[in-house]
Swiss-Prot record:
Subcellular location: Cytoplasm
HAMAP family cross-referenced by the UniProt entry: Carboxylester
Residues annotated to bind substrate: W22, S82, L83, F143, L144, A145, L146, Q147, H235
GO biological process: biotin biosynthetic process
Domain AB hydrolase-1: 15-242
Function per UniProt: The physiological role of BioH is to remove the methyl group introduced by BioC when the pimeloyl moiety is complete. It allows to synthesize pimeloyl-ACP via the fatty acid synthetic pathway through the hydrolysis of the ester bonds of pimeloyl-ACP esters.
Annotated pathway: Cofactor biosynthesis; biotin biosynthesis
Name of this protein: Pimeloyl-[acyl-carrier protein] methyl ester esterase
GO cellular component, one term: cytoplasm
Top-level division of the source organism's lineage: Bacteria
E.C. number: 3.1.1.85
Keywords: Biotin biosynthesis, Cytoplasm, Hydrolase, Serine esterase
Organism: Shigella boydii serotype 18 (strain CDC 3083-94 / BS512)
Reactions performed catalytically: 6-carboxyhexanoyl-[ACP] methyl ester + H2O = 6-carboxyhexanoyl-[ACP] + methanol + H(+)
Amino acid sequence: MNNIWWQTKGQGNVHLVLLHGWGLNAEVWRCIDEELSSHFTLHLVDLPGFGRSQGFGALSLADMAEAVLQQAPDKAIWLGWSLGGLVASQIALTHPERVQALVTVASSPCFSARDDWPGIKPDVLAGFQQQLSDDFQRTVERFLALQTMGTETARQDARALKKTVLALPMPEVDVLNGGLEILKTVDLRQPLQNVPMPFLRLYGYLDGLVPRKVVPMLDKLWPRSKSYIFAKAAHAPFISHPVEFCHLLVALKQRV
């Protein structure tokens, strides 16, 4: 039986589901889960194939979203970080009646660089896929180091991410590859133009994976959404700026 690992804490009248990024697991939220569970009923999830949600293999974005929805509350704010942002966005597109608000963190509707679009160069993603089969622990560590580069607390933030990864069994190589395939191929720029719920996009100014140039482009493409840039954060603003991060979510709660 393939089970999604799911933990619920807090007693808030609004549910908040947190979806982590590639290679990680729900332990990444431990820096903010106490604070958030005093305002929300908080749901911590290991995405299929990651952390404690074992036995899935590589999934498409649509299948990943459906697997996560099985155990989800009827209505919630869905927050997704990085790859998790694509999963949360997919749920908002296919089941809008279950999403009170959509929050994406250091995420892009199209992670891969295109002619007219800043992002991760496709050969970099392909390189990660190649290196995974050679030395996958080192490849994951390199990817984590990329996420915190440039911040004042880069070293300790990278340590926090590494600790999260090492706390639980590593995902299977095919699961990690499948996640990179989603980052390489998915493009939700047009579909997300029409999501009906409040939509908040959070970014780090120093992010090396989601260039800040996408922010004004998406402001224009999705005029109903709101964006916020953490001036001194990279790819994990909730680790480097936990207080500011939680304030934004509590403020959003008033709008749903």
